[in-house]
């Protein structure tokens, strides 16, 4: 009643209160944020993984074997994808790049594997009786120093034949650089020699059909990973890069093993680039990438003939049998103009970086032949070329002119080269290789695309700086090509706050998930989170293609090398990449399954978003941030969020299990089913609607009937006296009596009030009828209960009576049976006893009978 009084007195206050309460409820509901899982977001993290190779080996040279074993690589993509990532800045570091270590290990493995089936030259570590090669082969070559470099020794030595206790003497030609006098006797009259590496390294002869020609190798990332590429034209190898793209494979990298000069690599697109881990540290190598290549043409003008010398069962040593007349030493030619122009640009660049005015280039300061010379492979022979003619000049940065150059005025710079057959392996200490001689004349042309330099040390504060050629660590050769790449791991799972909360409904059926991550969708990496989430469907459809394509590549690679009955390092990497891709896919699908999000791109959860993880507003997150920025912000809380989602899903599944366990009562309490309740509600609404309709119809009929009888209905504003109770006195003049609170009532104030009053009366009527019905039902239940209780007591008494009667009858029956059995038993015993006595008395009766006969 007090509520109705407040409603009548303060209607506006009542309305505003209800409105304010609704607004508070809406605001409180809107402030709740929930964790939502997104699958297929463009997010990556730095990682190290197994890369596989792609190559077009068949298009270069058809041969049975090459040292790079590229026939085990997958074919290159004729239309490679490169997707530019807008608004993305990524840090690169060429000096801490695992791709360099990986290619280094792969090339070492390929070299070692190519030499495994080849002949070991351990039996050749014997005394060699050598004499100088005949002068008739020297031709027009003059000069003692030159002839000593190219002169060969004619050596004879004893080897074991097929019969191991037999030896025979054979002859072979060796380069002077490949043998040393025994007992360190360096005199020219010495005749006893040995191979140079016999006391330090194990020597293996390269197989005669193995080729050292470098073939471009593309390194590719497996599914679930991607290769980021820096496209800045002046990128120095370290630091942030603002022009980033994603590729599946690198460009074709030629595994050229060389020192001092980088051959057949990639060129800088604009100006010369100087790269060093620390330019002020003279112990660090300096890699120079040229913007214009310099041609270098090398030749061995004389021709060799090769012979096969058996050195044991199934083994042969390939040596030089003879040579044509030598018309010149092995050498390389470089255009003087092109080289000086290139060296001038390099000097200017170095001077500007080091703030020096004079740059000096000098030859190598000493060391092994591989370091002091430009060593490389030319047509199967290993050349060691003297580069003092290249690095012997001084450049003034101010006038950009060379000074104190010792070069002649010839248009070509000629580098004198020596050839060695016993090679110190660059893979490590203690390994050497014997390269069989190549028949015929040798010519090769290459392009100088880079330099490897070292800076002289000291505390010299002058304006001069001295640089020398360096090299020897093949990792620097690979860095010169891989400086712009890095491998990243795709993280397709992302979590972010949204206003959507998971609704717990019937247990969902788990769908088959989508495939593993591929690089195609990374194009949305620079977009905001809101824009990137719109393309999740397109992105996720590309995921499975990674594994499918990898499977096809693997099958093609295995098919290509199945005749070998073994896997090279590339085949092993193919298998590793395939397994890794499947593992990534299964890991992501396992997480989605644990979270109840299998087969979903956007999956809501019941985990509330904690503002301590990120207190940014929803609009700021989705409109101003990329997925990469968002992932970096919540990276420390990702593990916690994952655990909360898992716990929430576990609790939800427990609740669903308990709910499903209640279904076994459906056969007994089917009317408790929600569908049945909906049917009951529908029937109730129909009944109420029918009652309201009947009430309206009856009211209209009553009104029409009264009008026909000449009755005018009262005004809606007429106050009717309310009926009084007989024991309530009417008021007196002194107002001593008590007045009733409802002496008169106002009918209605309008049509809405009429409807409301009618509905109220109908509800009261329904309430009273339902109450009476419930009371009647309760009375009936009470009577039925009482009657039932009495019936149960009657049945119980009846059951007790009959049980007692049955018990007595059973007892009587047992007694009767016992008596009958006892009597029968006595009779049987008596019969048996009499029979027994009769049998015992038979002899007595016989004796008595005989006595009577005798008497």
Swiss-Prot record:
Residue numbers with lipid attached (S-palmitoyl cysteine): 763
Motif (YXXL motif): 711-714
Transmembrane stretches, start-end: 684-704
Signal peptide location: 1-31
UniProt entry keywords in alphabetical sequence: AIDS, Apoptosis, Clathrin-mediated endocytosis of virus by host, Cleavage on pair of basic residues, Coiled coil, Disulfide bond, Fusion of virus membrane with host endosomal membrane, Fusion of virus membrane with host membrane, Glycoprotein, Host cell membrane, Host endosome, Host membrane, Host-virus interaction, Lipoprotein, Membrane, Palmitate, Signal, Transmembrane, Transmembrane helix, Viral attachment to host cell, Viral envelope protein, Viral immunoevasion, Viral penetration into host cytoplasm, Virion, Virus endocytosis by host, Virus entry into host cell
Protein name, entry field: Envelope glycoprotein gp160
Residue numbers covered by motif Di-leucine internalization motif: 854-855
Region named Fusion peptide: 511-531
Family annotation (Gene3D superfamilies): 1.10.287.210, Human immunodeficiency virus 1, Gp160, envelope glycoprotein, Single helix bin
Highest rank taxon of the organism: Viruses
Site (Cleavage): 510-511
Biological process, per Gene Ontology: clathrin-dependent endocytosis of virus by host cell; fusion of virus membrane with host endosome membrane; fusion of virus membrane with host plasma membrane; positive regulation of plasma membrane raft polarization; positive regulation of receptor clustering; viral protein processing; virion attachment to host cell
Spans annotated as V3: 298-331
Location of the region described as V2 in the Swiss-Prot/TrEMBL record: 155-198
Gene assigned in the entry: env
Keyword Nuclease among record annotations: no
Coiled-coil regions listed in the entry: 632-666
UniProt region (MPER), positions on chain: 661-682
Post-translational modification: Highly glycosylated by host. The high number of glycan on the protein is reffered to as 'glycan shield' because it contributes to hide protein sequence from adaptive immune system.
GO MF annotation, one: structural molecule activity
Chain residue ranges for the region called CD4-binding loop: 364-374
Region feature (V5): 459-470, 462-470
């Amino acid at each position: 009643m007090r509520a109705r009084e407040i409603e009548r007195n303060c209607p506006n206050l009542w309305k505003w209160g209800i409105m304010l309460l609704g607004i508070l409820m809406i605001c409180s509901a809107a402030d709740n944020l929930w964790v939502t899982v997104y699958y297929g977001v463009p997010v990556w993290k730095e990682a190290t993984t197994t890369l596989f190779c792609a190559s077009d080996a068949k298009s270069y040279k058809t041969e049975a074997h090459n040292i790079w074993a590229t026939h085990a690589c997958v074919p290159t993509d004729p239309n490679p994808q490169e997707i530019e990532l807008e608004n993305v800045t990524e840090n690169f570091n060429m000096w801490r790049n695992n791709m360099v270590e990986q290619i280094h290990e792969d090339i070492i493995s390929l070299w070692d594997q190519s030499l495994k089936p080849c002949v070991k030259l351990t039996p050749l570590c014997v005394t060699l009786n050598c004499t100088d090669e005949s002068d008739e082969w020297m031709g027009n070559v003059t000069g003692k120093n030159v002839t000593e470099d190219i002169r060969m020794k004619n050596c004879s030595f004893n080897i074991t034949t097929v019969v191991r206790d037999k030896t025979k003497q054979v002859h072979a030609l060796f380069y002077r650089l490949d043998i040393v006098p025994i007992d360190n006797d360096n005199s020219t009259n010495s005749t006893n020699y040995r191979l140079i590496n016999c006391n330090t390294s194990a020597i293996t002869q390269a197989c005669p059909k193995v080729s050292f020609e470098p073939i471009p190798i593309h390194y590719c990332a497996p599914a679930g990973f991607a290769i980021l590429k820096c496209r800045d034209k002046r990128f120095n190898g370290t630091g942030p890069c603002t022009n980033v793209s994603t590729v599946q494979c690198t460009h074709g990298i030629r595994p050229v093993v060389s020192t001092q000069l980088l051959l057949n690599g990639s060129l800088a697109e604009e100006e010369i680039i100087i790269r060093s881990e620390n330019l002020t540290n003279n112990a660090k190598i300096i890699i120079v990438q040229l913007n214009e290549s310099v041609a270098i043409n090398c030749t061995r003008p004389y021709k060799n003939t090769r012979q096969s010398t058996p050195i044991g069962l199934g083994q042969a040593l390939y040596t030089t049998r003879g040579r044509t007349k030598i018309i010149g030493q092995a050498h390389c030619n470089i255009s003087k103009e092109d080289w000086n122009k290139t060296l001038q640009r390099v000097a200017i660049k170095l001077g500007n970086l080091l703030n020096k005015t004079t740059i000096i280039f000098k030859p190598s300061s000493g060391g092994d032949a591989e370091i002091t010379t430009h060593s490389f492979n030319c047509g199967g022979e290993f050349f060691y070329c003297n580069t003092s003619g290249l690095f012997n000049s001084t450049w003034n940065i101010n006038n950009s002119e060379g000074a104190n150059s010792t070069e002649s005025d010839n248009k070509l710079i000629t580098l004198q080269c020596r050839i060695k057959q016993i090679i110190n392996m660059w893979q490590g200490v203690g390994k050497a290789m014997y390269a069989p001689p190549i028949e015929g004349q040798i010519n090769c042309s290459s392009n100088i695309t880079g330099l490897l330099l070292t800076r002289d040390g000291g505390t010299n504060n002058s304006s001069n700086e001295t640089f020398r050629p360096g090299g020897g660590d093949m990792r620097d050769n690979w860095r010169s090509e891989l400086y712009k790449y890095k491998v990243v791991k795709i993280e397709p799972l992302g979590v972010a706050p949204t206003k959507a909360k998971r609704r717990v409904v019937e247990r969902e059926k788990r769908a088959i998930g989508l495939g593993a991550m591929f690089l195609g969708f990374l194009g949305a990496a620079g977009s905001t989170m809101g824009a990137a989430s719109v393309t999740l469907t397109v992105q996720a459809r590309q995921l499975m293609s990674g594994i499918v394509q990898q499977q096809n590549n693997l099958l093609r690679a295995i098919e290509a090398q199945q005749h070998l009955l073994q896997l090279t390092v590339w085949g092993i990497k193919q298998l590793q990449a395939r397994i890794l891709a499947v593992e990534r896919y299964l890991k992501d699908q396992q997480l989605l399954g644990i979270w109840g999000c299998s087969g979903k791109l956007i999956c809501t959860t019941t985990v509330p978003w904690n503002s301590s993880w990120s207190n940014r507003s929803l609009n700021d997150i989705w409109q101003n941030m990329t997925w990469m920025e968002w992932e970096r912000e919540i990276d420390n809380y990702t593990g916690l969020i994952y655990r909360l989602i898992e716990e929430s899903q576990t609790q939800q599944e427990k609740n669903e299990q308990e709910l499903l366990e209640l279904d076994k009562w459906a056969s007994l309490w089917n009317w408790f089913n929600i569908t049945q309740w909906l049917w009951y509600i529908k029937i109730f609404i129909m009944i109420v609607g029918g009652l309201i309709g009947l009430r309206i119809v009856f009211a209209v009929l009553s009104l029409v009937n009264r009008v026909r009888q000449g009755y005018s209905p009262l005004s809606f504003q007429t106050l009717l006296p309310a009926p009084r109770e007989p024991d309530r006195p009417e008021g007196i003049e002194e107002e001593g009596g008590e007045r009733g609170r409802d002496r008169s009532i106002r009918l209605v104030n309008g049509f809405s009030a009429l409807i409301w009053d009618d509905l109220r009366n109908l509800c009261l009527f329904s309430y009273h009828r339902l109450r009476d019905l419930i009371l009647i039902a309760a009375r009936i239940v009470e009577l039925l209960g009482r009657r039932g209780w009495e019936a149960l007591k009657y049945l119980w008494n009846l059951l007790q009576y009959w049980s007692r009667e049955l018990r007595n009858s059973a007892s009587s029956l047992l007694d009767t049976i016992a008596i009958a059995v006892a009597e029968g038993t006595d009779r049987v015993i008596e019969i048996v006893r009499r029979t027994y006595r009769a049998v015992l008395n038979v002899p007595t009766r016989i004796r008595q009978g005989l006595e009577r006969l005798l008497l």
